[in-house]
Amino acid sequence: MAVDQLGVELYSIDSLGADPNLVGRVDTEGNGEQVTLTSDGVFAACDDAGAYFIPTGKFSGTGSSTRFAEDLTVDHIAVNNGIIALSLGAKGIALYDVTEPTAPVEKGIFPLGYTYKSQFWGEKLLVCSREGLQILAIEQ
């Protein structure tokens, strides 16, 4: 869970209806805005401090987090098959190859207008912007 100035917290829920148990908290630069959970860890959008990949082990004290897109304001993150789309507000979206999540590779910034959120839908990227819904094909 993104917890603004406190960074990112990870909880476990043992069964349906059970109370969540705090696994740990990772402090981030900037405000934790939104998180996307993957099998390897958590990608976190941290407003004007870019984005992070935080391996699951980091929440229990092992491993280290990877900060990237430090010079961008990241509001939302979508992940699919080793590609990550960062929603950047007025700058559009940025795409990164995160096949190796601890070493993201920038693929470009695409000015699509003011972008609020993006979501992968199959092999397409749906982008919600002031201009309306845009549907993009991502080629690797």
Regions found by a protein language model. Name each.
Residues 1-140:
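Feature marking well-ordered beta-strand scaffolds used for ligand recognition
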